[in-house]
Amino acid sequence: MNQKTLEKIEFPDIINKLWQKAESFPGKQLALKVRPLSDSKIIEEKLLEVEEGLSYLRFKTVDLSVLSDFSEIFLKLSKESMLTGQEIYRLGQLLKVSKDTFFEISRGAFPRLKQIVKLLFFDEALVKDIERSFWPEGTVKDEASPELKRIRGQIARLKDKMREAVEKYLKEPELAKYLQEPLISVRGDRFVLPVKASYKSQVPGIIHDRSNTGQTLFIEPYSAVEAGNELKTLELQEKEIIEKILKDFTQRLACNLTEIKRTYELLGEIDLIVAKARLALELDAYKPRISENGVLSFKQARHPLLGKKAVPFDLTLGKEFDLLIITGPNTGGKTVTLKTIGILTIMARAGLFIPASPETEIGLFGEVYVDIGDEQSIVQSLSTFSSHLLNLKFILENAREGDLVLLDELGTGTDPREGAALAKAILEELRGKKVKVVATTHTSELAAYAIETERVENASVEFDPESLKPTYRLHIGKPGRSNALYIAQGLGLKEQIIEKAKSFLKEEELKLDKLIFDVEQEKRQLEKAKEEVANLLISLKEKEAKLNDELENLEKTKEEIIRKYREKYQQKLLEIERKGKLVIEEIKEKIKTYEEKNLAKLLEEARQKTKEFSQNFALPFEPIKPYRPKVGETVELVEVGQKAEVLAVGENYAIVQAGIMKLNVSFDQIRPAQKQEKENEKGQVKKAGLELTKKQNFNLELDIRGMNTLEAEPVVEKYLDNAYLAGVEKVRIIHGKGTGALKKFLWDYLREVPFVKKFNFAPQNQGGDGATEVYLK
C-alpha cells in the first residue's frame, strides 16, 4: 500500500494510538510495523486474534512493561561478554513473564494465543536462582553462594572492629582534645579521625587526606591499619566471587540465547494482540466481516479519530452502484466521510477492529488510491488544480478492476464548466475500468451525471434549513444542493436580489435544480411510504405479541384446570384404597365366622363391591407422570427447603432463581411448592434444625494461598454460594500478603457479589492484612 495514501487518510495516527496501547518495547516496535494485508485468510486470522485478546484482557494479570529494550543485552550475550547483575535480573524477569504468560493463557479458551505461547521458553530453576542471587537493582545477594555469605560476614565483623579501634579516641577525653570534631570520617574505604594539624604526633597513624586550609589532617590510627589491610584483602576476594557468579549466570543464559530471543519476540506479538484489543475498547470498535466480493457495506460507521463528535453513517458500495458522488456545500462533512471510508477499509485490512456495527462488510480491493487535500507546491510551481491533476493522472494510469478510488472535490480549482466536464470524463474512464469510486464535489453537473448514468449514485450531506448549518448526516440517493440562494434568503437578503440572482442562472442550471428538486420530492414520498410500512409492521408485531400473551394465559388456565382435577381424583383414589382395605377386613372377619360352604358366596360379594368402587371412581385422565417443572413455576429445593422460580427446563434438569442466586439442579432435587400452613408449621422445627446443622458443619475459613486468580475465582465463588445457602453470616478467606495480587482480585470480586454485606481485613491475631473477613446478608 502506498505510504502517501496511508498518510492522506491519517492511518499513521491510528498506528500511533496502537503504539501507545502496547506495554512492552517489542510490542511497540511491532505496532509501528502494522500495515494493511491483502490475503483474506490472514486478515480474518488477525481479527480473530484481537477477538481472543479482548477475552484475555478480562483475566490478564501479567505486566509486560518489564520487557524494555534488550538489544544491548542480547548483543553482549552473543559475544559471551559478562553481564551485569542488573542485566541478569532483567533476563530473569523476562523468563518469569514468559512462564506466567504461558500458564495464564493455557488455562483459558484462547486457541490462537495458545499456538503462540506453546513456543515460549522458560527455565523455572534458572529464574529461581536469579531471584535468589540478585536484587532488582543488580546487587548480588549474600545467598548467591555460601562463600560470598562467609566473606561478607567477615567484612562486616572487621568493619565493626575497625570502627571500635577508632571510636576509642572519641570516648577518651585525653585523646578527644586532639580532634577538630568528635566524629569518624571515611577516606578511601578507611576509617579516619579529623586531627588538628598541630597534634598529629599525638595520634600515631597514616595520613590519608588534609583539609583545604591545612588545619585538619585525616589520620587512620595504627590500631586500625592492620584491620584495614585485611579488609582490602577480603573485599578483593568478594569481588572475585561476584565476578565468578556473574560469569556463571552469563554462561547459563548464553546457552539459551536463541530461545530467549524468540520468547522476547513472541511476547511482543502477544502484547500487540492485546494492544489491538485495548484500541478496540477505546474506539468502541467491532470485528468487521471480510469478503472477497469487492463490496463495501458500512453500518453505523464513525471516523476513529473524532471520538464522540463523529456522526455515524450507512453506505453500501458495489451492490446497486459502483460510483458514489457526494455533493453539497463546503465544510459539510464530505471530506470526513471520504476519509472515514478510506481509514476503516485500511484498518480492517490491517487486522484492526473498526468503529462500526459488526454487520459491516469490508470487501478486499486490489489497491486503494486517494486524492484528498491541497498539495499546492511552491518548489514545483504547481497550483492546487495542477497537483490534483498529477494525482489523477497517476490514478488513471495505475487503477485496475477491483481497486478502490477516493477523490475529494473532483472538478474544482478551475473554471466550473470545464472542471465539471473533466470530472465526468475521469469518472467515465474509471467506470469503464470497473473501479469502485467515491468522489466528493460541489459541482451540480455531477449530480445530474449520477442520475443519468447506470451504476452511479448520488449522495449528500444533510443541511439544516433552520440553523443554516450542515448536520454531517449522509443521505444515499439524494443529490446535494449548494443552498447558496436558500442561505441568503434565510439570512434576510432582499427578495428582489434573490430573484435577480435566479435570473442570471442559465436555463440548464435551473433545469438541473428542478431535476434535483423532483428527485428529492420522490425520495421524501418513498421515505414517507417506508415509514408507514414500518409503523404497520410495528402494529402487527404488537398484535402478535398480544395474541401470544392470550395464548400463554389460556395455556396456564388449562394447566390449572388439569392440576385441580388431578388433585380431586387423587383424593378419590385414596378413598378407594381406604374403602378397599375396609372391604378386605370385612371379608376376613366373615371368613372367620362363616362356614366353608359360604366362602364362594363371600368372594363373589367382594368382587362385586370392588367392581362397584372401580365404576364409581374411574379416573378420566392418564396416570400421573413423574414430576417435571415448567418455566415460571415456583418450586422448593429439597435439600434446604428454599423456594425458587424455574427459569429454564432441560431434559432432566432445571435452572432456578433462588433469591439472588441462579442454580442448576436435577428434577430429584426439587418438588412443587405448596402453601400449606400446617405443613409449614410442622416443618419449622425440622428446617431450623437443618439450617443449624448446615451452619455447624460449614467450614468458616477458606485458604486460597498459592493459587493464581484464575484458580481462585471458581473456588471463592462456590465457597460463598454454599456459605450463603447455609445461612452463614461471616467467613474468613486467607489470601496471604505476597505481591497483593490475590488480595486485589478478592476485594474486586467481593464488590460484585450481591449478597456480600461488607468485608475487611481480619484482626491481627487472626491473619491481619493476610486474610479478609466477609459478612453475608
From Swiss-Prot:
Pfam families named in the record: MSSS (PF20297), MutS_V (PF00488), Smr (PF01713)
Keywords: ATP-binding, DNA-binding, Endonuclease, Hydrolase, Nuclease, Nucleotide-binding, RNA-binding, rRNA-binding
Alphabetical list of PROSITE patterns matching this protein: SMR (PS50828)
Gene3D superfamilies: 1.10.1420.10, 3.30.1370.110, P-loop containing nucleotide triphosphate hydrolases
Signal sequence extent: none
Domain Smr residues, every copy: 702-777
Highest taxon above the source species: Bacteria
GO biological-process terms attached to the record: mismatch repair; negative regulation of DNA recombination; rescue of stalled ribosome
Enzyme Commission no: 3.1.-.-, 3.6.4.-
Coiled-coil blocks: none
Binding site for ATP: 328-335
Recorded GO MF terms: ATP binding; ATP hydrolysis activity; ATP-dependent DNA damage sensor activity; endonuclease activity; mismatched DNA binding; ribosomal large subunit binding; rRNA binding
Kinase in keyword set: no
Protein's job: Endonuclease that is involved in the suppression of homologous recombination and thus may have a key role in the control of bacterial genetic diversity. Acts as a ribosome collision sensor, splitting the ribosome into its 2 subunits. Detects stalled/collided 70S ribosomes which it binds and splits by an ATP-hydrolysis driven conformational change. Acts upstream of the ribosome quality control system (RQC), a ribosome-associated complex that mediates the extraction of incompletely synthesized nascent chains from stalled ribosomes and their subsequent degradation. Probably generates substrates for RQC.
NCBIfam families linked: mutS2 (TIGR01069)
Similarity field: Belongs to the DNA mismatch repair MutS family. MutS2 subfamily.
Subunit structure: Homodimer. Binds to stalled ribosomes, contacting rRNA.
UniProt xrefs under HAMAP family: MutS2 (MF_00092)
Name of the protein in its database record: Endonuclease MutS2
Source organism: Carboxydothermus hydrogenoformans (strain ATCC BAA-161 / DSM 6008 / Z-2901)
